[in-house]
Amino acid sequence: MSEERVRKIFEEAELAPRVGQLEVTEKLAEFIESGKRILFAAPTGWGKTIAVLAALKAAGAIPAYWLVRALDIGERIAEDAARLGMFAYVAGGREKTCPLAEQLGDSIHDFCKIARHKCPHARLPPEPPVAKDWREILKLAKGYCPYYAQDMVPSELVIQNYHRRRVRPARACVVDEAHNLVEPHEKVITIARLAEAASALRHSPASSHLVSAVEKLLRHVVSIAEGPVLTSLYFDEDCYNELRRIYAELLIEEPERARALRPLVDLAQGTAYIEEEIHIFKEPQLPRYRPLVLVTATPPPVLPLEVEVELRIPQAVKPKAVLLSHVTTAFSQYSKRMATEYKKLILDWAKRYKRTLVVVPSERVARDLRAWATHYETAPPKDWEGVLMFRARSRLSEGLDLKAELVIVAGCPYLPPNVSEQLARYYRSKGLPDPAKLAIDAPMLVATVQGVGRAWRDPSAPPTVVLADWRFERYKEELKAYFDLEEH
């Protein structure tokens, strides 16, 4: 791959490459041409998106998929692709594009797979529709399925979330914010929805054995203030198979009734943990494409991904991080007194700064601290001031720019123990070394650094960081890759 070829792509787009960007793009293009699985790590603001797009174009690896955790950033990627003369399409999932999504809720995915022959919209357009994103498809779709019509849209780059099906031939696949692949896929349901599912099951042709098992499971869930949901104590294989059969039959005959059962199906096949709501976790999945480009600003110290080559651009500037060891959110040590200590440190630190992000590890901690936040779990106004609080791994933890001068990580954001155990089994099946430690450490470190990344939008002006939990002391060596540490 010649540097002139890469340089010409930048010149035609009237883009002035940053220091090192041409060389990195050239190397990426070489790896893509040779079919490698690549980790590309560079700081926020370095220009990763343009570099990867230019490398795809230089390598002739088009059409390609670009996978994102949330479609919020899809428009920006499409705009960058357009600057390089590439036509991108931002594809929505069924929940955004299916005409039956509002009626069937999250059971729409299973309905589409099992009962598509019953769908009144299951037709394709006579000609490929021309559109830039799923919103335009919705406006165009008359008498055909908007979701499947997206597979016909002419484009060189398809931008979609990690979980949407991929049926088009592609010469490469890019995974944006690939650090998310160390985390299990999480779904949240309310206890009320689970109770509705149990009620719906009683009015279905279910055996007394299954109904009894579900009622015992529901009593178990209601009795837990916080902790793992021990589904396997109540659900044997016969229960699970019968539930799946009833659910599939209802999808065909009475899909709206099937919708009510979906929370039970999710709970039966996932690993769950209760806080205020039920969090259901499933194993992460790595796309099986080759070439594959994994893009991230925050790679964990050990990346449990099947990577063959790495390109890492070091951070020119690191945030200063203060370690506070007099507090912790560890389950056995957290108390009302500890919550008061966290309130004190938030007030003491936040009064020195215009904007403060507070990242909390769980709903349990959020309940005690959110009254002290100006904004909680909501995108703030553009000119916001005060304290914005969100849970690690929540919607606000990814994809939004929440520029702030101070970030307080109020507790180590570990996964629940039973979820870490499930993740360890998955890592063990992949032959990764020390899977139990990896399943505990990697998601916690990624969630910590991601929380800080939400506030750090200017590479030359990092926020001050407060790591408020004595357990961060265990990770000094790993944290030095991201922060200049200072003990307080």
What are these regions (language model features)?
Residues S2-A41:
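Conserved pre-motif I regulatory segment
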Residues E3-F10, I62-E156, R245-A248, I252, ...:
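A substrate-engagement module of RecA-like helicase motors
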Residues S34-A54:
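Walker A/P-loop
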Residues D72-E75, E79, L140-L157, N161-N241, ...:
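Signature of the SF2 helicase/ATPase Hel1-core->accessory helical subdomain module
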Residues K132-S155, R166-P169, D236-K320, W372-P380, ...:
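A contiguous, basic/glycine-rich beta-loop/short-helix subdomain that forms a polymer-engagement track
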Residues L324-V358:
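Conserved interdomain hinge at the start of the Helicase C-terminal
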Residues V327-S335, P380-R471:
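Conserved RecA-like P-loop NTPase helicase motor core
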Residues L357-T378:
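Conserved helicase motor "Helicase C" RecA-like lobe of SF1/SF2 P-loop NTPases
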